[in-house]
């Protein structure tokens, strides 16, 4: 689990409200929703860390175990069809695209997030 924390160290920890704000304001932003206790999230975080190191992309992280975010996150996940973690969310022009696939390759991550 320490490796997970190391893998997400270059991500910007944020809240569900920030993701909704990006949608509402038609920003372009990418979010990783996950938790350190999820083996699939740990796998995805390792691949994502390599992409971030290579591209210097700004990716946001929403901790799905953050007690203060549970209600908001549940509503957000329900509203936008994010059934499981890891949830990889890319927002552009008020549209949201979601992938929940821990086996995404580095190239798939880059393609999905437009990196």
Language-model-derived ranges and their functions:
Residues 33, 56-73:
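Thiol-based oxidoreductase modules, predominantly thioredoxin-like and allied folds used
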Residues 18-57:
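Local sequence-structure signature of Cys/Sec-based thiol-disulfide redox active-site neighborhoods
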Residues 83-115:
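Non-catalytic, surface beta->alpha helical segment in thiol-disulfide oxidoreductase systems
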């Amino acid at each position: 689990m320490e490796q997970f924390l190391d893998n997400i160290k270059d991500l910007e920890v944020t809240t569900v409200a920030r993701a909704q704000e990006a949608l509402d304001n038609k920003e372009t932003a990418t979010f990783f929703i996950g938790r350190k206790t999820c083996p699939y999230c740990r796998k995805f975080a390792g691949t994502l860390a390599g992409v971030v190191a290579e591209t210097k992309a700004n990716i946001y992280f929403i901790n799905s175990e953050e007690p203060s975010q549970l209600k908001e996150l549940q509503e957000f996940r329900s509203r936008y069809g994010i059934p499981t973690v890891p949830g990889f969310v890319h927002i552009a022009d008020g549209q949201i695209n979601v992938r929940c696939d821990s086996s995404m390759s580095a190239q798939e991550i880059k393609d999905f997030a437009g990196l």
